[in-house]
Structures are given as structure tokens and as C-alpha cells.
């Protein structure tokens, strides 16, 4: 069929291309004249194909068709006119000329919303259904007979752009092609339009788009979204015309608190909040506006209205500079009248129109493979310099908002000036707790107060979980490629390394960790952990599985590993940063978001870590950190219906309670690393000197505040006395002192309550008849220092033989020479099974003992040798689930099975 296409825009271009693919002959294209030297996309495409293109500025004069225009049209011999999107008035001499007449696309369900702003009015009226109509043109305004209609649901927050992009554009193209096909087949219907329900609304212009505030919130919301992006709903405020975009009625969780924005005629002043601008209808319901355009055309997040643009300019890498130049070339092609694109060049002031926005977005997305870029981003950053900054932030995984304001406590320590955040970290911002509640965090070296830290309340947990859920379901974190997620975690690890001295010093200050150990282990292994799991991000794979075929058809079954969602992580006080890293790195690598509760007594490195996530570009809401009590914060995380996983390290008693709460709330996935009473068996055929050194480390490492510490040493009778003698000699060489001193190897216990428990533990051991060889008391100096302690003659029935001290207390028991099975029986006679160890030169004995020990980790001729690649976790009442290694990822993933039939 010979077709004349009359119209413009990318929509017209796509319809033209599809009609040619269907085999129709497009005999001519009629489009609008070039604007500022730029041709319309429809005309450009037709010219490339050698199709005659006509660009009449008008078809009529004084209501009469121009004869020369009609003559050029008639010379083509078209059998059908197709008007996919046309802004010109076409005379009836042209409309009625072809054998099959003319068909027009209209973006509403006629007879409703006749007129040029049909999409706008569909939204303004709050219609629940939208769609398009293809009708036979007549001499009325959108009144012709109906040929084809398709409808869709209108979502509560749809705008002109989202409705157009989701349905009206892609389905409209298909609809036009289908309509032409029906005409060619002779089956196209002609149904008269009913007059019942018919409406006509005028074209929406800027001067008519002013907001009427004397109506309910829903009506105001519909007005704003119905005018988004063109012409833009506006109001007068702060002495200028403000245009509002991205409105939503979804205000659950929002509190009507913020900086007041007086709006003449409004029922109540607007409130500028961190979420955006809260507005009120005359029914007192809230709506939220996320973007504001100033009178000078500058677009900004509504949350930044009173702040301006506070983010500092990014320094671009060489690769990013190359990308910027490629984007500059795109701007040059789209803006041919601009001699040179500079940072100050404004896209729209240089002549760009909405169609150019679509072109720019598509070109940049093609240039930056996989980038999430939307038309709105161009409106938010109209100058080239701003656009490049926005683009680079997106490529880096940042959200592009202004830098977070961080309040610090500053302390000068050992030639370092520590800057320590002390507020809750929720949704990418440091904020006070509900009611501004705080508590003191104590320096265990001298008992002094380091600073006041925000004390999270139940409402703060709810806010943090909401932020994590939003980041998981709607944020950038769930959209970026797995490899890009890994890149962000690598950057975070690099930043941790750059700040390792500061982090180690904070660990020493807040947790009493010996600085040199903190640098190597607390911080060093944390860095290694994030690097290890960063490498896993793009290697989380499913499988294809052969199943019985549904003959004669066939089947394909595959599995996908998916993140579970919002995770709660509750960490202990012995390794504040390392325990955070062990769990959080795997959690984030799997694609989850997280709410972390650090131990109440050691919050400061976790909050410093939060700051580093901002610097690394981790999107807001992905990581949230809440210092506070277990009874409030930990309990609420366990009970919260939106938390899908809890990772916990701590006592068995609390672990049982968490497990119960997780089961009763929503059957959360749980992993628990709980108490231990790890046995270390030292045989007479060992390397005694090594056994002594490793035995010392197994107990006194990190002041005994070590989950896998050897809770009980079994020493073969023939070397027992010699072993004890050497241990006591080594204990005498240990320097107890300020953990910040580089030659200290034994610092203070973590907090005073724990120190008191250690004193009581030793008193009970003596009372039950164990021999106290050395230590057993607090060191007579300020702070929470406890003497390295050695007990011998410990019998199996004694309290100290069965219960964990979690301190620098060595418990030694004899066993008869050669009685391997008996000592194994004693070693396994515990409800704990976190770790264990054996020292022997006999490989057969080592293998046999390692087989029989009931523990998640067995060390042979070594101790404390954990590694980021080796799974770590316990048996029995020491918990279940793994940290570290590939196995840790499975704790934060769920497996979905998908089966196809074909």
C-alpha cells in the first residue's frame, strides 16, 4: 500500500520505519521545518532512505488550503495518510484525498480527553485507565470514527513521561502498524465515537499550569504529575516562580518536620525535608515533591532548596575525562549552532528541545554501556559541566546528591587528629537518635569518657529498615551490574586502607585493642575481607539442571542466586570493625542492604566505617548503622517484618533468643556465631617450643577476647610440667600497658562489667580447687586491665572447665600418655563446637584427631590462623552458618528455580 506519513518526532520516525519493514511503500514524508538548523528525526530517517521529504511551514492560509502544497501532495498518489504525531493543521483536501482516507494516533481513550494535551488531562483527572486511540480523520477535532483502541492501568505516580515511555510510545507504534495492516486486509472497523462521556480540554501552557492550592492533596498531586515535564506545574514562593516535578502521595514513614516554605494560598506552608518538599492539600493530607525548578531554569532536588548545590566538583580520572569528551561530541552533534561546548553551555538555552533530550539520553546510554540514565537527569543538570558531574557520579555508583554533613568528635592521639562521627547513620546521613538520646562511650585504658554517642530507639530502627528497603527495592544498588558493585566494594577497601592508622587508633581507644594488633588484624583483615568479597560480586552463578522432558515438548530448568533483601547484622565488642567486615562484606557482595547494630560499648569504628561508605560512593540506604542496646535495637531488628536475614555474633543465650524472635516474626533466615569452649590438645610428640608459643596465642591473643580462644588446654602428662613452666616464663615477659604504645602486647579488657566477670570467674576456679599458677586479678592501675592468668589441675566437673571466660585465662588439664580416645572424649564433652586444635608431629594422629574433634574449625600445629577465603563457623550450641569464604555468600542469598517449556 502506498502511504504518506504526516507528522514528526521519534514516534513518527519509528512508525515510518515499521511500516517500511511491513512492506508498505512510503511515497512521501511531510514533517515540520528544521528548527535552529536541526531536522526532525522523521525527516532525517526518510532522507536517508531516499524517500521524498516535504517541510511545509503551513498547509493553509486564512482557512484555505494552499494550492501548491496540495498539488505536491497529490502528485505522490498516496492510498492512505498515516498521522502518528502531527502538530500542524492538515486541510481536508489532503485528509480525504487517498482512497483509504487518513488515520490519526491520539494518546487517550476517545471520546475522553479530546484535544492536544490528552495525556496531561488523563493524569490531571486522576483517570485509573489510560491508553490510545487510532481513529479515522474527519473535519472535527478528534471526533472521527474509531479504528483501534488499547488501554493500560495508570499508576498512582505516573507522569506524562512515564506513561508515554511505558505504554503510549511502544504500544502506540505497534498499534499504528496493526491499524495499517487491518486497512490493507480490508478488515479495519469504523465505529462511530459515542458522545456519552466525551470531554474536550484545552492545550496546557505554562500560564495555565499554576497550582490551585484550595483542593485535596490528591488533586494537587494529579495536577503536578499531569503537567510534568511540560509545561510544569508552578506556584509563587520566596519571591520567584517555582515549578514542581516528581510528585508522590506515598508518604508513609515521613514525619511532617522540616524547614518551612511559605506558599501564598496554600493551606499550610510546605516543609523542606531530607526526602523532598512536603506539601499539604486542604484536607491536610501530605504529598511529596522531589524536584524543584527555579525561575532561572535550574533544576534541583527539593531537599536541597534552602542549601543550594553543596556538592564539591569531582576530580575525573583519565578514563572519565575520555568519556566526558565523547559526551561533548554528542552535545556538539545535537547543538549544531553552538560553536564550542563549554562547561557553562546550557543544553536548553542552546536550542535543545524535548526530542533532543531523548536523543542525548540514548546516545549517552549507548556510550556508557549499562548506565541507568533518564530524561529527568538532563533536566536536573542542564549545563555541560553539571551533566558530566552527574554522569560521573552515576558511573561511580553515587547518587549525585550534595555531600553529607558529618559532625565529628576530634581527638589528638599519637600525632593523629582523629575525626570520629558519633550520630546514627540512616539513609546516607548522620542523624540524631529519636529524642536526641545519647550515651557515653568509655576508653577502657583509663575509664574516661571518649564522647557522647547517639542512642538508637525503636523508631530509629524502623527508619533505618525503611531506608534499607527503599535502597534494595528502588535504589541504584539493585540496578547496577554485579561487577560495578564489586568496584564499589574495592573502592571501599582502598579507603579503609588509606585510613587504616586512624581506624586502628580508634579501635585502641574505644575497644582497648593493642594498636599493632589492631593494625594487622582488626583493620588489616577487615580490608582483606572486603577485597575478597568484592571479587565475588560478579561470580555468583546459578546452574542449568537436566530434568525429565514434558514430551513431546522440552524443558529447561535453571537456578538463580538472588539477594534476600534487608539484612540485620548484630556484632560483638571484641573485634568491632573485623566482625562488621566479616558479615557486611559478604552481605553487600550478594547484593543486599544492611542495618548494622555495633556493640553498644564499641560503636566508633562502625561509625567511621559509615563515613567511608559515603566516600566510596555506596548508595544511600545500602548501609545503615545504629549504636544502641540489644534489648531495643537488636530486638526490633529480629522482630521487624521487613528484615529478611539476621547475622549475629555473640553469646549463646542471646543467640537462642534472636532465633526464636526471627521464627515468630517472619521466619527470617538466621546465621549465628555463638559461644565457645575450644579445646586445644597438646601431645608429647609435639614441637614443644612452638606449642608453648601457639598455646600462649590461643589464649592471650587480643586479651583473650577472642571467640575461638582455646578455652581449655589438654596437655599430655609427660610434658605437662615443662609446658606449664615455659608458659609462666612467657607470661612474665608480657608487657601490660597502654594499647597505643607500640611495645605493648597486653591491653585493657573491653569494658568494666567484663573485667568484673573475669575476677569472679577466677575466684570461682580457686574455690572449686583449681591451682592458680599466676594472675587472677585486676592490674593495680587505672583502666580495665586484667592479669594474664594460668590455672592448672582443672578437673572436668569444674565451672572453669566448662564455661567460657572470654578473657586472658589459660585453663590447663592433664591427660594420660597415649590415651588419645580418652582426651578426645573429654574435649568433645561440651555443648560448644566453634574451634579446636592439636599439636603433634604424628600425621596419622593429627588426621585422626582432626576427624574426631566436633568443631567447625580444627587447627593442626597452629592456632588462630583464620583467612578470608576459609569458611568460619561453629557446631552445636556455637551456632550455625558461616562467615568468610564462598560459603558465607550463601548465608545472604536465596536460590530460585526457573523452569521453561518449549
UniProtKB/Swiss-Prot annotation:
Which catalytic residues are annotated? 106, 673, 707
- UniProt cross-references to CDD domains, sorted A to Z: ALDH_F1L_FTFDH, FDH_Hydrolase_C, FMT_core_FDH_N
- The main place the protein resides is cytoplasm
Q: Where is this region: Aldehyde dehydrogenase domain?
A: 417-902
Q: Which residues form the Carrier domain?
A: 318-395
Q: Which InterPro entries match?
A: 10_FTHF_DH, ACP-like_sf, Ald_DH/histidinol_DH, Ald_DH_C, Ald_DH_CS_CYS, Ald_DH_CS_GLU, Ald_DH_N, Aldehyde_DH_dom
Q: Which residues carry this modification: O-(pantetheine 4'-phosphoryl)serine?
A: 354
Q: What tissue specificity does the UniProt entry give?
A: Highly expressed in liver (at protein level). Also expressed in pancreas, brain and lung (at protein level).
Keyword NADP present in the record's keywords: the answer is yes
Subcellular location(s): the record lists: Cytoplasm, Cytosol
What keywords does the record list, in alphabetical order?
Acetylation, Cytoplasm, NADP, One-carbon metabolism, Oxidoreductase, Phosphopantetheine, Phosphoprotein
Phenotype caused by lack of the gene: Homozygous knockout mice are viable, fertile, develop normally and do not display overt phenotype. However, they have metabolic signs of folate deficiency like the accumulation of formiminoglutamate. Mice show reduced hepatic folate pools with a strong accumulation of (6S)-10-formyltetrahydrofolate and a significant drop in tetrahydrofolate levels. This is associated with a strong decrease of glycine levels as well as levels of several glycine conjugates.
**E.C. no:** 1.5.1.6
Enzyme superclass (EC)? oxidoreductase
* Catalysis: reaction(s): (6R)-10-formyltetrahydrofolate + NADP(+) + H2O = (6S)-5,6,7,8-tetrahydrofolate + CO2 + NADPH + H(+)
What positions does the entry give for NADP(+) binding?
571-573, 597-600, 630-635, 650-651, 673-674, 757, 804-806
Write out the GO biological process terms.
Answer: 10-formyltetrahydrofolate catabolic process; biosynthetic process; NADPH regeneration; tetrahydrofolate interconversion
Where do the segments described as Hydrolase domain lie? 1-310
N6-acetyllysine PTM positions read 882
Entry PTM: Phosphopantetheinylation at Ser-354 by AASDHPPT is required for the formyltetrahydrofolate dehydrogenase activity.
Q: Does the keyword Oxidoreductase apply?
A: yes
Which positions does the site annotation Essential for catalytic activity cover? 142
Pfam families attached to this UniProt entry = Aldedh, Formyl_trans_C, Formyl_trans_N
Q: Which family does it belong to?
A: In the N-terminal section; belongs to the GART family. In the C-terminal section; belongs to the aldehyde dehydrogenase family. ALDH1L subfamily.
Its domain description in UniProt is: The N-terminal hydrolase domain has an NADP-independent formyltetrahydrofolate hydrolase activity, releasing formate and tetrahydrofolate.
Q: What is this protein called?
A: Cytosolic 10-formyltetrahydrofolate dehydrogenase
- Per the UniProt record, the source organism is Mus musculus (Mouse)
Amino acid at each position: 500500500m502506498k502511504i504518506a506519513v504526516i507528522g514528526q518526532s521519534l514516534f513518527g520516525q519509528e512508525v515510518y520505519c515499521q511500516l517500511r519493514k511491513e512492506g508498505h511503500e512510503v511515497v512521501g514524508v511531510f514533517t515540520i521545518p528544521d528548527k535552529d538548523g536541526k531536522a526532525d528525526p522523521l525527516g532525517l530517517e526518510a532522507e536517508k532512505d531516499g524517500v521524498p521529504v516535504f517541510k511545509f511551514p503551513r498547509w493553509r492560509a486564512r482557512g484555505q488550503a494552499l494550492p501548491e502544497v496540495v498539488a505536491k501532495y497529490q502528485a505522490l498518489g498516496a492510498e492512505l495518510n498515516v498521522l502518528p504525531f502531527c502538530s500542524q493543521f492538515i486541510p481536508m483536501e489532503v485528509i480525504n484525498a487517498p482512497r483509504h482516507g487518513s488515520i490519526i494516533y491520539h494518546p487517550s481513550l476517545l471520546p475522553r480527553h479530546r484535544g492536544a494535551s490528552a495525556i496531561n488531562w488523563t493524569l490531571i483527572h486522576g483517570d485509573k485507565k489510560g491508553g490510545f486511540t487510532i481513529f479515522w480523520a474527519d473535519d472535527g477535532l478528534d471526533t472521527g470514527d474509531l479504528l483501534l483502541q488499547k488501554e493500560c492501568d495508570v499508576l498512582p505516580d505516573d507522569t506524562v513521561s512515564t506513561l508515554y515511555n511505558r505504554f503510549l510510545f511502544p504500544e502506540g507504534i505497534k498499534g499504528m502498524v496493526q491499524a495499517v495492516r487491518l486497512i490493507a486486509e480490508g478488515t479495519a472497523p469504523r465505529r462511530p465515537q459515542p458522545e456519552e462521556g466525551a470531554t474536550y480540554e484545552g492545550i496546557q501552557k505554562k500560564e495555565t499550569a499554576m497550582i490551585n492550592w484550595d483542593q485535596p492533596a490528591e488533586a494537587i498531586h494529579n495536577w503536578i504529575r499531569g503537567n510534568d515535564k511540560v509545561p510544569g506545574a508552578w506556584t509563587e514562593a520566596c519571591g520567584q516562580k517555582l515549578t514542581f516535578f516528581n510528585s508522590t502521595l506515598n508518604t508513609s514513614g515521613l514525619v511532617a518536620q522540616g524547614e518551612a516554605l511559605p506558599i501564598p494560598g496554600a493551606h499550610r506552608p510546605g516543609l523542606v525535608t531530607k526526602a523532598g518538599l512536603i506539601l499539604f492539600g486542604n484536607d491536610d493530607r501530605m504529598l511529596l515533591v522531589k524536584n524543584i525548578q527555579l525561575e532561572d531554569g535550574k533544576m534541583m532536588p527539593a531537599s536541597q532548596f534552602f542549601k543550594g548545590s553543596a556538592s564539591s566538583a569531582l576530580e575525573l580520572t583519565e578514563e572519565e575525562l575520555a568519556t566526558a569528551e565523547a559526551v561533548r561530541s554528542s552535545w556538539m552533534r545535537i547543538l549544531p549552532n553552538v560553536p564550542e561546548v563549554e562547561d557553562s553551555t546550557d543544553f536548553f538555552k542552546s536550542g535543545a528541545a524535548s526530542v533532543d533530550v531523548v536523543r542525548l539520553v540514548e546516545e549517552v546510554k549507548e556510550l556508557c554501556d549499562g548506565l541507568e540514565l533518564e530524561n529527568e537527569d538532563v533536566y536536573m543538570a542542564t549545563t555541560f559541566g553539571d551533566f558530566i558531574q552527574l554522569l560521573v557520579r552515576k558511573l561511580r555508583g553515587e547518587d549525585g546528591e550534595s555531600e553529607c554533613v558529618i559532625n565529628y568528635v576530634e581527638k589528638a592521639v599519637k600525632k593523629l587528629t582523629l575525626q570520629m562521627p558519633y550520630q546514627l547513620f540512616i539513609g546516607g546521613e548522620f542523624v540524631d537518635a529519636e529524642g536526641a538520646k545519647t550515651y557515653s562511650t568509655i576508653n577502657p585504658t583509663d575509664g574516661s569518657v571518649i564522647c557522647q554517642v547517639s542512642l538508637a530507639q525503636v523508631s530509629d530502627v524502623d527508619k533505618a529498615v525503611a531506608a534499607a528497603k527503599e535502597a534494595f527495592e528502588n535504589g541504584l544498588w539493585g540496578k547496577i551490574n554485579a561487577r560495578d558493585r564489586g568496584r564499589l566494594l574495592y573502592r571501599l577497601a582502598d579507603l579503609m586502607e588509606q585510613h587504616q592508622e586512624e581506624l586502628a587508633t580508634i579501635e585502641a581507644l574505644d575497644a582497648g585493642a593493642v594498636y599493632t594488633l589492631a593494625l594487622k588484624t582488626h583493620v588489616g583483615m577487615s580490608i582483606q575481607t572486603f577485597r575478597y568479597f568484592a571479587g565475588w560480586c560478579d561470580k555468583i552463578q546459578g546452574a542449568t539442571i537436566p530434568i525429565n522432558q514434558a514430551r513431546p515438548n522440552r524443558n529447561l530448568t535453571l537456578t538463580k542466586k538472588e539477594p534476600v533483601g534487608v539484612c540485620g547484622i548484630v556484632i560483638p565488642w571484641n573485634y568491632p570493625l573485623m566482625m562488621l567486615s566479616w558479615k557486611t562484606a559478604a552481605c553487600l557482595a550478594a547484593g543486599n542492604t544492611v542495618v548494622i547494630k555495633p556493640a553498644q560499648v564499641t560503636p566508633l569504628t562502625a561509625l567511621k566505617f559509615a563515613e567511608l561508605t559515603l566516600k566510596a560512593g555506596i548508595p544511600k540506604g545500602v548501609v545503615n548503622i545504629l549504636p544502641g542496646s540489644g534489648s531495643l535495637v537488636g530486638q526490633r531488628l529480629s522482630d521487624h517484618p521487613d528484615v529478611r536475614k539476621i547475622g549475629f555474633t555473640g553469646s549463646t543465650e542471646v543467640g537462642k533468643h534472636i532465633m526464636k524472635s526471627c521464627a515468630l516474626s517472619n521466619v527470617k533466615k538466621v546465621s549465628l556465631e555463638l559461644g565457645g569452649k575450644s579445646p586445644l590438645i597438646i601431645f608429647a610428640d609435639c614441637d614443644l617450643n612452638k606449642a608453648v608459643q601457639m598455646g600462649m596465642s590461643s589464649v592471650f591473643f587480643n586479651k583473650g577476647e577472642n571467640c575461638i580462644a582455646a578455652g581449655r588446654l589438654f596437655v599430655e602428662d609427660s610434658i605437662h610440667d615443662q609446658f606449664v613452666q615455659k608458659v609462666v616464663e612467657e607470661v612474665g615477659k608480657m608487657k601490660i600497658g597502654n594499647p597505643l604504645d607500640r611495645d605493648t602486647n597486653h591491653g585493657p579488657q573491653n569494658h568494666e562489667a567484663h573485667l568484673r566477670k573475669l575476677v569472679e570467674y577466677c575466684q570461682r576456679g580457686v574455690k572449686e580447687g583449681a591451682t592458680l599458677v599466676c594472675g587472677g586479678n585486676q592490674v593495680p592501675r587505672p583502666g580495665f586491665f586484667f592479669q594474664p592468668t594460668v590455672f592448672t589441675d582443672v578437673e572436668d566437673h569444674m565451672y572453669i572447665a566448662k564455661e567460657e571466660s572470654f578473657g586472658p585465662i589459660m585453663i590447663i588439664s592433664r591427660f594420660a600418655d597415649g590415651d588419645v580416645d580418652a582426651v578426645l572424649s573429654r574435649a568433645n564433652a561440651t555443648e560448644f563446637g566453634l574451634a579446636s586444635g592439636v599439636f603433634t608431629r604424628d600425621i596419622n594422629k593429627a588426621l585422626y584427631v582432626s576427624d574426631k574433634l566436633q568443631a567447625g574449625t580444627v587447627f593442626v600445629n597452629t592456632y588462630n590462623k583464620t583467612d578470608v577465603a576459609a569458611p568460619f563457623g561453629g557446631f552445636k550450641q556455637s551456632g550455625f552458618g558461616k562467615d568468610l569464604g564462598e560459603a558465607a555468600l550463601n548465608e545472604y542469598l536465596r536460590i530460585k528455580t526457573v523452569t521453561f517449556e518449549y
